[in-house]
Amino acid sequence: MGMNWYFVGVDLGQSHDFTAIAGLERAELTGEWDPVVFAWRKRIRLGLRYLERVPLGTPYPDVVERVVRVTRSPELAGRCHLIVDATGVGRPVVDLLRRARTECNLIPVIITGGEAEGISEGYHHVPKRDLIIGLQVLLQGAGLQIAAGLEHGPKLVTEMAEMRVKVTSAGHEQYGAWREGVHDDLVFAVALACWGARKVYPNAPSGENAHWRFEGATLLGY
């Protein structure tokens, strides 16, 4: 079995929106020998292991402290990536996280309404549609496990069901909850973590580790 890596996604809320923290585990599992391709079968398993919704009104320094505590979990030490929504108020929080010296590689993301990814001054610019569709593909293709017993697991499923795409008069797509008063913080925290896993590991390894497949049930325990 290869080393497991962890991806912590943080969607930062404002006065009327929750902040959400998601912890994703990427496990590389070795299966049986395949004589046809002359390689060991490998399985990449993505599992949502942690999901937290920070109470409304929590000051950003306290949010940073909470994120730091999560990243300093012994299981994550030296093998995690922290993907943070740096859109809007997120930049000052990213600066606080940098000064806090988390145990993770920090990847700030600015969520855009565009169509192409890019990077500028250390900030990744990622279309909202890429985050949402990427998560939907994983769920529909059984590529993401959601651990049973997560308090906010059912809320995540509800948020995904509430997501809609709206086409503006200019022909641009907008993704979000289809009615007011519905939150989407859990969806984006998980989507950021999943995006991070795909960004850091975009391709299957070559050579003797080239034979991969995804495994996982869409939901565990719900």
Language-model features and meaning:
Residues 1-110, 117, 125, 129, ...:
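RNase H-like, metal-dependent nuclease domains and their acidic two-metal-ion catalytic environment used
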